[in-house]
């Protein structure tokens, strides 16, 4: 009887041990699969986050450059209103959304969002026909554009109060009214350096000019237009400088930055790659819209 009792106790102990082993195995199997699931889920999140970061930190940005919009004439810097409308249709059909320079700058500096396929439309010089033909089309297609004005042109037509789409330029009252329109943004195209008559091409430094003289000249000109914007447009200050003729000197960019401009526009063709580095906003490439070719012929080179 004594031996049987010991044997009975051993059987119970073995039974308990087996139950414990089974329980440990079940829980171990469960926790192993849970750990594997969590690791896999985390890896997937890392992959998605990496892709998202790459997408948000590197943006492909085409910029189109227009000047005058006219029905009566054609030329290298003149586009017919019908051509402009066809361009707008083509841009939208390709899935692109227009943005302003301020929205682009905000993306780089403040991590704001941009549409999936952004594009910037620019008009140089501030021709009055931009108001006559371009602005109604911007409204029609719910698009935005950047107009860079030459201050002396605007002052001249403000004084004469002449409004002629064939040869005139926007007056300050036109600009002030358009400032309240979300489809148009205004930028600085110099006060009086859009000329070849003085021996200086745009704002390029003369070979005989000292750095100090050049700095004072460019600072004075650009500041004059900045101040006129403040006076005529409720304190508004342009954040982007647009080079006349795309004429650039190696010294000019630092002066532009020192004056507080967050971006600059060149006339060099190509498509921009935008990152979170503020330096990518300077000397942005633009593509001049020439007359005589279809929207598809022009945009096939710069749109995906």
What does each model-found stretch correspond to?
Residues 2-16, 29, 33-122, 129, ...:
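C-terminal active-site subregion of NodB/CE4 polysaccharide deacetylases
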